[in-house]
Amino acid sequence: MANYSFTVRAEWDHEAELWYVADSDIPGLAAEAPTTEALLVKLRILIPELVELNRHLISVNIDPYLQIHLMSERIEQMIWY
């Protein structure tokens, strides 16, 4: 159903206790949220808006269906001794 898939890589900011967009193939995408689920809610709003604004930078014919591939990474450090 989805014509085009956008990849968004989210990372955990331990100090701020937030997930944030670390990288994406969508020009201008920036967002943060306390959970990946909350981040996805924001992305569902932001991505269509940015696709419309940046249509001249995205060289594909996009239909009404967009797919979001959200990859998250969280690295924890701990004292083991």
Where are these regions (language model features)?
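Short, charged, surface-exposed hinge/linker loops at domain edges
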Residues: 1-9, 15, 37-81
